Design a protein with these regions (language model features):
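A short, conserved, highly charged catalytic patch centered on acidic carboxylates
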Residues: 2-3, 11-160, 176-211
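Central hydrophobic cores of alpha-helical transmembrane segments
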Residues: 165-167
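Short active-site-adjacent structural elements
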Residues: 171-175
Length: 211
């Protein structure tokens, strides 16, 4: 049996191994109810932008810094630190076996938000949002194969999963849906450093947190 690491898979390989089909959706409102931000939220968002921009100006922002300076503050502001949400960091996924090709895939996700108030199966919590982060100089699309691989395993437990791949500046949300074949929808790319799209980013995170 061939053992692969999800980090090394290409998007083409993920499509072939799991049968994923890619589609595009140009509106978050097809999935989420987006609410206006308060003045306090807008001010905190501006502070996150300013903090991250200082590091961007200095040069490359590492993956760890992206998580600490951008992702973590955004999740806190969106409500992900409050019950019933629980944040899980850098845990190994259960091995994924592709029997037709005699392949076993291993991997470790970056950040997973689960709901402690919802079970999909006994001892299995509902996945609210799966996040894959990269350093600021890497295109966000490079995180998509890992994201889809980790989400695919959980489609046995729930009908759909929200995913997000980010380099701190750009944010690509993905709506992943079970089916034969499974489908993932790419939503419009958002950007922390642009006023309108950063507000939209926080609105989306808040809406996902309420699922």
């Amino acid at each position: 049996m061939t053992i692969l690491n999800a980090r090394n898979l290409s998007l083409e390989e993920v499509h072939r191994l799991f049968g994923f089909q890619k589609q595009y959706n140009d509106s978050f409102s097809n999935y989420l109810s987006l609410q206006p931000l308060t003045e306090a939220e807008q001010q905190e968002l501006k502070q996150i932008q300013d903090d991250f921009d200082r590091y961007l100006t200095a040069g490359k922002v590492s993956e760890g810094q992206v998580k600490f300076l951008a992702v973590a503050p955004l999740l806190r502001l969106a409500g992900f630190y409050r019950y019933p949400i629980e944040i899980v960091l850098e845990e190994n996924i259960a091995d994924i076996e592709v029997e037709d090709e005699d392949i076993k895939i291993k991997g470790r996700f970056d950040i997973l938000a689960i709901s402690k108030a919802k079970h999909t199966k006994p001892q299995t919590y509902f996945w609210v949002l799966l996040i894959e982060s990269k350093n600021s100089q890497i295109d966000i699309s490079t995180g998509l194969p890992q994201l889809l691989t980790y989400a695919y395993k959980n489609l046995d437990n729930q009908k759909s999963v929200w995913g997000l791949t980010t380099n701190g500046r750009s944010y690509q949300f993905v709506y992943i849906e079970e089916g034969n074949p499974p489908i993932y929808y790419l939503l419009p790319e958002l950007n922390l450093m642009e006023r309108e799209r950063s507000s939209h980013l926080l609105q989306v995170l808040k809406a996902i947190c309420q699922l």
